[in-house]
Regions:
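A charged N-terminal "starter" segment
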Residues: 1-130, 169, 174-178, 205, ...
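Flexible, glycine/proline-enriched loop segments at strand-loop-helix junctions
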Residues: 13, 103-110, 150-161, 190-196
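Short acidic, glycine/serine/threonine-rich loops at helix termini
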Residues: 54, 77, 97-102, 119-122, ...
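Conserved anion-binding
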Residues: 115-176
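Buried hydrophobic side chains on well-structured beta-strands
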Residues: 134, 182, 220-222
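Gly/Ser/Thr-enriched, mixed-charge loops and adjacent short helices
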Residues: 170-192
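Glycine-rich beta-strand-to-loop/alpha-helix junction loops that act as flexible
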Residues: 186-187, 220-227
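Single conserved hydrophobic/aromatic residue that forms the stacking wall/gate
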Residues: 235-244
Length: 244
């Protein structure tokens, strides 16, 4: 219940977070994901990097999905173990990559051979072996706004499917790189779960393609993008708040 009385003297604007609801949601995620072996949920730190919120999330065993050095720092400060932090995103700068290497984070999600070469060079500099997952563009459309779909061949993200074998082969010849997985992300604000089913079917095809070449990866990251329905009847909001 929203504690309206407590906020009558609070200056606006301000953010109110229902941490009890957050904890209940996290507990549900923990219980449901625990029903499946080797299934891990990561929180996208870009959604909200408030330290109090991050600390609560870390207490429930979720990993952290980061897209900047600042987010890696925030996740570490909030108590996320380094081996639960994944660094995704385009345009990673040297200092951000080095931060991930120095803290031995779980994985770098790599968008291109050029990025892989930079990570390898920095890993060599620090005497590290960087664990990486390649972001593959699966050419899967998502039922969402055209400006926030990211999984079609025409989109600028990831490595084309036809280049996957070549990229993995090249990576396996690089001393300071360990390929541990594949990464996918088809868009944001996705409400049709059929989109994720189509993605998983495509991933199975790609894994079979790799298996024929005796190539196996440890991790599959299906990305995020679960949407929020804004089709909410206002009567559920207007009636309880009418007295105020």
């Amino acid at each position: 219940m929203f504690p309206v009385d407590k906020f009558q003297d609070t200056r606006t604007p301000f953010y109110y977070y229902d941490t009890q609801l957050l904890r209940e949601t996290l507990q549900t995620i923990k219980e449901e994901s625990g029903k499946h072996a080797n299934y891990h949920v990561h929180y996208a730190v870009k959604a909200n990097a408030n330290q109090k919120i991050l600390r609560i999330i870390s207490q429930y065993g979720l990993g952290a999905d980061c897209v900047s050095g600042g987010e890696i720092k925030a996740a570490l400060e909030a108590g996320f173990p380094a081996d639960s932090i994944v660094y995704a995103g385009v345009g990673k700068s040297d200092w951000e990559i080095e931060l991930g290497l120095q803290n031995d984070i779980a994985c770098f999600n790599v968008e291109s051979i050029a990025e892989l070469e930079v990570i390898n060079k920095l890993a060599q500099k620090h005497g590290k072996k960087a664990r990486v997952a390649f972001r593959i563009n699966p050419n899967i459309g998502a039922h969402t706004h055209a400006n926030i779909t990211t999984g079609l061949a025409e989109n600028k993200f990831g490595i084309a499917m036809q280049d996957m074998d070549k990229v993995i082969d090249e990576a396996q010849t690089i001393d300071n790189i360990e390929v541990i997985g594949l990464h996918f992300h088809i868009g944001s604000q996705i409400l049709d779960m059929g989109d994720f089913k189509a993605l998983c079917n495509r991933i199975n095809d790609l894994q079979n393609q790799l298996a024929k070449r005796n190539v196996f990866v440890q991790n599959i990251n299906v990305g995020g993008g679960l949407g929020v329905s804004y089709d909410l009847s206002l009567i559920h909001i207007s009636e309880p708040t009418r007295p105020y």
